[in-house]
Amino acid sequence: MNAPDKTGTDRRAVPAAVDLDALIRAEHRDPFSILGPHDDGKGGQYVRAYLPAALSVRLLARDDGRELAELHMSDVPGFFVGHLEQPQPYLLKINWAGGEQITEDPYSYGPLLGEMDLYLFAEGNHRDLSSCLGAQVTSVDGVEGVRFAVWAPNARRVSVVGSFNGWDGRRHPMRLRHPTGVWEIFVPRLQPGEVYKYEILGAHGILPLKSDPMALATTLPPDTASKISAPLKFEWHDQDWLQSRAGRHDVAAPLSIYELHAGSWQMEQNDEGQWRQYNWRELADRLIPYVKELGFTHIELMPIMEHPFGGSWGYQLLAQFAPTARYGSPEDFAAFVDACHQAEIGVILDWVPAHFPTDTHGLAQFDGTALYEYADPKEGFHQDWDTLIYNLGRTEVHGFMLASALHWLKHYHIDGLRVDAVASMLYRDYSRKAGEWVPNRFGGRENLEAIDFLRHLNDVVALEAPGTMVIAEESTAWPGVSESTQKGGLGFNYKWNMGWMHDSLQYMEEDPINREHHHGKLSFSLVYAWSERFVLPISHDEVVHGKHSLIDKMPGDRWQKFANLRAYLAFMWTHPGKKLLFMGCEFGQWREWNHDEQLDWYLMQYAEHVGVKKLVGDLNRIYREEKALHQRDADPTGFQWLIGDDKSNSVFAYLRWSNDGEPLLVVANMTPVPREGYRVGVPLQGAWTELLNSDAETYAGSNIGNGGEVISEDEPVHGMSASLTLNLPPLAVLIFKPKKG
C-alpha cells in the first residue's frame, strides 16, 4: 500500500523527484507528462498543476461549475495534486493573493497541430504557415483561447510568457512535437490584444526573451513584444481590381510606380510643433488622391513589416508576418490596401528575404543555436549591414520565407513584392574578400540554396497568387533574372535596371559642355534593354547618404537644374522599361530624403516645383494612353534609333512603336543651347502633333517649341522617307505623334 505524504496525497500522484525537480527549475522537456490529468490505474485520474504563488486550487465541473475536488499543495510550493474518481472535463479555480481565477487547464489538452501541418512545415512547403504557427486565436473542445506554436528544435524548454502569467516561464512550458522541433500549447481564455514572448532554455541557459517569428501583430517600437491578433477579418471591396489585375500586370501594360516611405511622406504637426505620423486610414485619405492626380498605376511601400530600428527604413525587419504597429493595426493596413484598389492603384511591398538584424529578441541564435542563420560567419554574417543571412538551405527557413511572401499576397491582397538585395543572395562572395567566404559544394561562388529559393518562390507565387508580380532589385549581370524557371531563369516578372540608373544619372550630373564626351552613357542602356524585363528605378537609395536629391544632382543654375530634371524625367518615361520614382522627386525636393521628416510640401508654392509635378502627371497620362510607350517594352522592335550619334549637339532621337504599328517620335536636346531648324527623319508624312514639350511654359520652362504641330517634308534622312524640321528647346525632350485624318 502507498502511504500518503504529509498533505494527505497518495504518493503515486506525485511525480518522481527528478521530474519534479526539473519542472521546478523550468528545465523539463515534457511538462505534459507530469501536469494535467493522468490515469490512476483504477478508472480515475490524478490532476496536477504547477502554479507558483497560488494559495489554493480547486477543481470545478466544466458543465455546471460544481466543486469536484481540492488540489493539495505538495511538499513543493506551488505544485498541487488532487484526484478525480472518474475522468471528466474540469476547470481550475485558483486563489491568488490578488484575487480568484477560473480557467481550463492548459495541460488537459492533447496534441494540437496536425501531422500534415508538421510534415509540410518540416518539408519547407507549408503554404499557409501564418495560420499554423505563432499565436492562433482558436477554439479547442468548445473553449476559446490561443494556440501557441514555435519552432525551436534545439531548445531544452520553451515557455510562452506574458502579462497573463506574470512573465513567469514556469507557468506555461510547452509541448515538444518530435521530430519537427515545434513546441505548442493551448492557453484557454486568452484574448486578442494580449502581449507575449517566448522564454527559451538553450543548451547553455535561458536566452533573452524572444519575439514570435510568426507574430501577426506587434507592440509599438521600441517595445519588442508580440501581440495576439485574431485572423484578419476584413470586408474587402476590391474584387473588380483583383479580377483585372493580371491584365494590368502584363508585360505589355503600362506600369508606373510611386515609391514611398509611409511614415515620412506626409505628417501632421500639433500646436506644440511636434510631428505625428499618419495611420494607414489617414494616409489613404491623403495619399490616394495625390497618386491618382499624378497618374501612377502603383505605389511601392518601403518595408512595412515590423522592424525595431526606424533608421533602417524597414529593411532590417524581424516580423515577416506582421505590419508595423507604427501606422495602426493589421485591419488598418488592409483598409489602406483596399482603398488603393478601389481607386485602381496597385500596391507593391518591399520584401527582405536576404538578411535580418542581430537584435537579441529576434531570430539570432533563436534557440541557442544558429537556427535561421548560417552558423559560420563567413556564410551567415553580412559585413555591409552588420546583419545575419538567412540559411535558405534549411527547409524550415526556406518554407518560413516562402510563407511570408504568400501571407502578404494572399491575406493582404498585395499586388507584388519587390525583393530587396537579390545580388547579395546570389553570390557567396558578395562584398567579401578572398578567404572571407565559403564556396558552394561545387567550389563556386554562387549561393545555390538562395538560387533554389528564389526560383521556388517565383514558381509558387505564380501558382498560388496568380496575377501578382515579383520584382528583383538585382545589380549584377546575372543572366535570366526575369526569364522563366522552365528556361533556366530565376523567374522574376521584372528586374530593376540598375545599369540604366547609374549611367543615366552620371550623364545628367555632367556639365552639358562635357556631355558630348559621355554621350554613350545615355544610349548604352539600349544595347541591353531587352535582355531582361526591366523597371527603370529612381529609388530612395539615390537621394540619401550624400548623393543629393534628384534635382540637386543636376548641374547649372536654378533654371538649368529644373530644365535638366524635366528633361531627365521625360527621357525616362520614353525609354523602354517600366517606371519607378521615389517620393519628392516628382516635384523636385531640394533636400535629401530624411525618414524623420515629411517631404518639403511648402515647395508647392513655387511655379518651378509645380511645373515638375505637372510634367510627371502629363508623362504618366501620355505613358498610359500611348500604346507605343508601353506595349513593346520587352520587344526590341518597339524601339528604333533615329539619332544616337550626334555627340557634338548632345541630341538623341528615337521612335517608339505600338503593336499596331503606330509610332511616337522622341527628341532630346541635352544642352542649354536651343537648336533651330534641326532635321529629324520620320516614317510617316503629314502633320505631327507635339504631345509634350518638357520646356513648355506650363512646366515653368522657356516655352521654346514648335507651336504644337509640325508638317513633314519630303526630304529623306536617318533612313526615313520624310523628315521634320524642329526647334529643339534647351535641356528639353519633345514627344510627337502623327496626326490622324
From Swiss-Prot:
Designated name of the protein: 1,4-alpha-glucan branching enzyme GlgB
InterPro entries found in the cross-reference section: A-amylase/branching_C, Branching_enzy, GlgB, GlgB_N, GlgB_N_E_set_prok, Glyco_hydro_13_cat_dom, Glyco_hydro_13_N, Glyco_hydro_b
Family indicated by similarity: Belongs to the glycosyl hydrolase 13 family. GlgB subfamily.
Intrachain disulfide bonds: none
Keywords linked to the UniProt accession: Carbohydrate metabolism, Glycogen biosynthesis, Glycogen metabolism, Glycosyltransferase, Transferase
GO molecular function: 1,4-alpha-glucan branching enzyme activity; cation binding; hydrolase activity, hydrolyzing O-glycosyl compounds
Annotated pathway: Glycan biosynthesis; glycogen biosynthesis
GO CC annotation: cytosol
Catalytic-site annotation from UniProt: 420, 473
Domain of life: Bacteria
GO biological process, one term: glycogen biosynthetic process
